[in-house]
């Protein structure tokens, strides 16, 4: 981590494997030391750079990132190229100190009294600059290939369109297993023990795991969904302590007692098993039977009365029909008589009768 009391170092003059550090004391600002560490002598003019030695003779560093087309960027080719060049540079850098390379002052060296940089003999060897171009290439090639944020050399990411089979699977699974948000855990009791506090959290995890879906191949059968534990209590038991027949659905419906038979157990074919046994000699059973008999008698009397009333209406309507039929026959006979009378009269009398009417 960088400290707030340090300053950026000035650009380093070119160095070679045969060039020793200048005899003058470096300035504090040039090597990033805090102010006030010692008197800052005026900077001496840098020594004239000597031509590079034989080791670094053919090494150059050219930034070609601006000339590379991102569309034509080949990851494998550049990876092999950079790795091969880096191996060569590291081998040359390792052979550099053996060939007579000296120690150079660097910003990370410890400062002695007066702000001067101490030699490498007292505090271990500094990082070897076997040759300037080798270190420079190592520093340039790493970010050139490894950095991803560079806009010019960003690796190409080929977008793959989703296949129709995957979309069909996802739609089918989404229809079979609709997502349901897990119920929130109930608030813990203020005086509950740790065991009581862990139970709601466990139920919440089970409920959350019950909502997960499985992606299977089309040929495999679809498993049933994981049952989610219900926060409601178990379905009510029958009158005799047995669960009602028909499963949990009938148990949740809640059986209604029959007023006629007086049963209070579950419904269906096994209603008699869940019915409470009643003593036939008790007064309660006798009163219930008497009420049932009275209700049956009333219903039978009402049915008989409705039948009698219906028969009376039928008789009345039949008599009215006969009477109307006789009336129709009488009117038909009178019509025939009047027609015979008009046929017997002459036409002159008919004309006179029509004139008088006019």
Swiss-Prot record:
Pfam families the UniProt entry points to: bZIP_2
Basic and acidic residues bias locations: 276-292
Positions of post-translational Phosphothreonine modification: 222, 226
Tissue expression summary: Isoform 2 and isoform 3 are expressed in liver (at protein level).
Cellular component terms per the entry's GO annotation: C/EBP complex; CHOP-C/EBP complex; nuclear matrix; nucleolus; nucleoplasm; nucleus; protein-containing complex; Rb-E2F complex
Residues bearing PTM Phosphoserine: 193, 230
Effect of residue 285 to A: Increases interaction with TFDP1 and TFDP2, reduces DNA-binding, transactivation activity and represses E2F1:TFDP1-mediated transcription, loss of cell cycle inhibition and adipogenesis induction
A GO term for molecular function: RNA polymerase II-specific DNA-binding transcription factor binding
Record cross-link Glycyl lysine isopeptide (Lys-Gly) (interchain with G-Cter in SUMO), residues: 159
Region (Required for interaction with TRIB1): 54-72
Modification N6-acetyllysine, positions: 159
Residue span of region Disordered: 1-55, 176-195, 213-310
Positions bearing the Glycyl lysine isopeptide (Lys-Gly) (interchain with G-Cter in SUMO2) cross-link: 159
Matching PANTHER family: CCAAT/ENHANCER BINDING PROTEIN (PTHR23334), CCAAT_ENHANCER-BINDING PROTEIN ALPHA (PTHR23334:SF5)
Family statement: Belongs to the bZIP family. C/EBP subfamily.
Summary of the function given for this chain in its UniProt record: Transcription factor that coordinates proliferation arrest and the differentiation of myeloid progenitors, adipocytes, hepatocytes, and cells of the lung and the placenta. Binds directly to the consensus DNA sequence 5'-T[TG]NNGNAA[TG]-3' acting as an activator on distinct target genes. During early embryogenesis, plays essential and redundant functions with CEBPB. Essential for the transition from common myeloid progenitors (CMP) to granulocyte/monocyte progenitors (GMP). Critical for the proper development of the liver and the lung.
Note: The V296A substitution has little effect on the binding of CEBPA to its consensus site (5'-GCAAT-3'), while greatly increasing affinity for cAMP response element (CRE) sites (5'-GTCAT-3').
Protein name (record): CCAAT/enhancer-binding protein alpha
Source organism (scientific name): Rattus norvegicus
Originating gene: Cebpa
């Amino acid at each position: 981590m960088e400290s707030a009391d340090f300053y950026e170092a000035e650009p380093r003059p070119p160095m070679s494997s045969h060039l020793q550090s200048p005899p003058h004391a470096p300035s504090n600002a040039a090597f990033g030391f805090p102010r006030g560490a010692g008197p800052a002598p005026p900077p001496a003019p840098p020594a004239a750079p000597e031509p590079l030695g034989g080791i670094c003779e053919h090494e150059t560093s050219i930034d070609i990132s601006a000339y590379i087309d991102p569309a034509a960027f080949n990851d494998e080719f550049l990876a092999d190229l950079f790795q091969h060049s880096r191996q060569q540079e590291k081998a040359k850098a390792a052979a550099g100190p053996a060939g007579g390379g000296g120690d150079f002052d660097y910003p990370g060296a410890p400062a002695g009294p007066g702000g001067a940089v101490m030699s490498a003999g007292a505090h271990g060897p500094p990082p070897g600059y076997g040759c300037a171009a080798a270190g420079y290439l190592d520093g340039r090639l790493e970010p050139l290939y490894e950095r991803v944020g560079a806009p010019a050399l960003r690796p190409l990411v080929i977008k793959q369109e989703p296949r129709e089979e995957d979309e069909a699977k996802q739609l089918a699974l989404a229809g079979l297993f609709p997502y349901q948000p897990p119920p929130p855990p109930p608030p813990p009791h203020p005086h509950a023990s740790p065991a009581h506090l862990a139970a709601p959290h466990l139920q919440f995890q089970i409920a959350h795991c019950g909502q997960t879906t499985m992606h299977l191949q089309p040929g495999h059968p679809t498993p049933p969904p994981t049952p989610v534990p219900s926060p409601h209590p178990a379905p009510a038991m029958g009158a005799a302590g047995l669960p009602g027949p028909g499963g949990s659905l009938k148990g949740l419906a809640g059986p209604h007692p029959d007023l006629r038979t007086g049963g209070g157990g579950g419904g269906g074919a096994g209603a008699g098993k869940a019915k409470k046994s009643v003593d036939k000699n008790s007064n309660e059973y006798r009163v219930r039977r008497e009420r049932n008999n009275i209700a049956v008698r009333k219903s039978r009397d009402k049915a008989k009365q409705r039948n009698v009333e219906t028969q009376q209406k039928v008789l009345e309507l039949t008599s009215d029909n006969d009477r109307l039929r006789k009336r129709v026959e009488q009117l038909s006979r009178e019509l025939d008589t009047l027609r015979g009378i008009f046929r017997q009269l002459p036409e002159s009398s008919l004309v006179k009768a029509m004139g008088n009417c006019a």
